[in-house]
Amino acid sequence: SDPWKAFQGLAGKTIVLTINSKPEKTGSRDILIKPEDGEQTLRYRAWIENNRKKVDAATNGKVGYIYVPSTGIDGQTDLYMQFMGQLEKEALIIDERFNSGGQIPDRFIELLNRKLYNYWARNGFEDWHTPFIGHFGPKVMLINGWSGSGGDAFPAYFKAAGLGKLVGKRTWGGLVGISGAPGLIDGGYVTAPSFGYRELNGELGIEGYGVDPDFDVENYPHELAKGNDQQLNKAIDLMLEALKNNPPKKPGKVKYPDKSK
């Protein structure tokens, strides 16, 4: 019989699953799970984790990897969660390939672009810095032709802020937006373009064109099928080179004055 038949209609619902190392009730235990309706989310998370492990192994733990799927709520959540977990990395690879957009990502750039003001010292403790949440090492961003809307703005702002180089392929080039969506009697709605991106000089700029990479790197399907991500490899090489040419510097221990004299 089909072992998955009992799970039909239960996707997204919390259920009790009885498990054991052998097919009998004795010694079994109950666990709570929420079944998925497909493998896409699991494969997506596995892809991110595999990329992170690859970067970690290739750089001896010096470089972090952050994937940003959108500039909407899920993208904000993923960026902040992964950023907080890798603050102590000496360099960061920001991967926004396939970024589906959402909101305008100015706050994303503010998080990545925080400047170091000072350190604080205390006897017997490690120094800490202001701002407390910030990464001050080199960065690089991965882009491709499936990144659009907010996924165009993110690398454009990243480059404008001087945060680092862009690696991959030119982005989609779609920053005309909509505002308001009149509802229809059948439950549908109507949208129409109502505003668009302009450069500081008044030109359309990346609208209809996209954001060019600094390093144009193609990812061929037959190489990806073998686990060979040339774009990610290039980003790793750039970060290792940046750390070699400009290793991170921290202040020495404070020499406290002798106030007894």
Enumerate the predicted regions with their spans.
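Cleft-lining beta-strand/loop regions that shape enzyme active-site pockets
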Residues: S1-I185, L224-N228, D237-N245
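Short intrinsically disordered coil segments
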Residues: W47-N51, M81-F83, E207-D212, P251-V254
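Metal-dependent DNA phosphodiester-chemistry modules and their immediately adjacent helices/loops
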Residues: K53-K54, S147-S149, L184-D216
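Short, intrinsically disordered/low-complexity patches at protein termini
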Residues: Y117, W128-H129, V190, D214-D216, ...
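Conserved functional hotspot residues or short segments at active or partner-binding sites
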Residues: E207, H222-K226, Q230, D237-K261
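Flexible glycine/proline-enriched surface loops and loop-helix/loop-strand junctions
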Residues: D216-H222
